[in-house]
Amino acid sequence: MTNIRKSHPLIKIINHSFIDLPTPSNISAWWNFGSLLGMCLALQIITGLFLAMHYTADTTTAFSSVTHICRDVNYGWLIRYTHANGASMFFIFLYFHIGRGIYYGSYTYTETWNIGVILLFTVMATAFMGYVLPWGQMSFWGATVITNLLSAIPYIGPTLVEWIWGGFSVDKATLTRFFAFHFVLPFIVTAMVMIHLLFLHETGSNNPSGVNSDSDKIPFHPYYTIKDILGLLFMFITLTMLILFSPDLLVDPDNYTPANPLNTPPHIKPEWYFLFAYAILRSIPNKLGGVIALVFSILILVLLPIIHTSKQRSMSFRPFSQYLLWILVANLMILTWIGSQPVEYPFITIGQLASISYFCIILIIMPATSYMENKMLKW
């Protein structure tokens, strides 16, 4: 008799994805982030569902409903802070996951990579709309500033902004629709994750050497299930310490002040995980130019398979490219810091230089370096 996990129509899908999946024998801890992201997504959906049971999407009661969750609901504070800090963990893992993809040349699986880029945009949209829901000062002004960027689109811009707002400013209609979208988008993300995995399992996983590993594969279970559980353990320890010891470490204090349309905060800034893109947006004096740069700062990832000039897939054996990638990481950290600073000298200049170097490294210097490395290896 055939084993049920290999014959049952539903269980065999799980079996081919998580149990008998042939996996390269040499993938490192950098390949743990996929499962960690899946766990984060599940955690966000569960905590979000419980928060939605107590939250009211109305401008008059939204702020006090969040206060009510923290003060009166059993373990409400824990659910709220798990959801808020879980989002930060989600983005940390996302950036590590993308970084690993760039380092080891995983972007050559174009379908998987492009679905991943669309996923990144969707997750960013979800996080932005979630940040608006507590209806604090930064929620309100963040929503006003970011949605207002769409007015830079020629001809249809101003109409589009009012259409998104549901009126002539960010108000009750905006909050209600943002809550609706914030609730539904994670389920769309889950569906897209399944497509992401479907494309990945068509080709099989990449590995640190960047060489085809069909001759050296091992079953996913028990080897990588154990490895993933260890990663999850580290994640939960870190997240628990963050929630229980310093839950507001990554939160803007301005968001503990109820939204007031008549009082603008001194520095409007998004959550830390959007600061690098925000710095790129601010570094261009022209509104439309800034919006294009903002979108392209993420969309540039789609170009990576096209501008890959190296004869090798991975950066494991390309020291110059490695060095450049770490310069890019440092550059992104500088952009993140600049995004949190006021718009004044010297931050404007630093932001502009960091923005230029960000695009130059990816579009010009990295492909040129890869080409040079080919010549050095007489390829």
Curated annotation (Swiss-Prot):
A single MF term (Gene Ontology): ubiquinol-cytochrome-c reductase activity
Cystine bridges: none
Cofactor binding remark: Binds 2 heme b groups non-covalently.
Cofactor: heme b
Example GO biological process: mitochondrial electron transport, ubiquinol to cytochrome c
UniProt-annotated binding residues for a ubiquinone: 201
Localization (cell): Mitochondrion inner membrane
Main localisation: mitochondrion
Membrane topology: Multi-pass membrane protein
GO cellular component: mitochondrial inner membrane; respiratory chain complex III
Extra remark: Heme 1 (or BL or b562) is low-potential and absorbs at about 562 nm, and heme 2 (or BH or b566) is high-potential and absorbs at about 566 nm.
Family: Belongs to the cytochrome b family.
Function: Component of the ubiquinol-cytochrome c reductase complex (complex III or cytochrome b-c1 complex) that is part of the mitochondrial respiratory chain. The b-c1 complex mediates electron transfer from ubiquinol to cytochrome c. Contributes to the generation of a proton gradient across the mitochondrial membrane that is then used for ATP synthesis.
Name listed for the protein in its UniProt record: Cytochrome b
Taxonomic source organism: Phyllomys brasiliensis (Orange-brown Atlantic tree-rat)
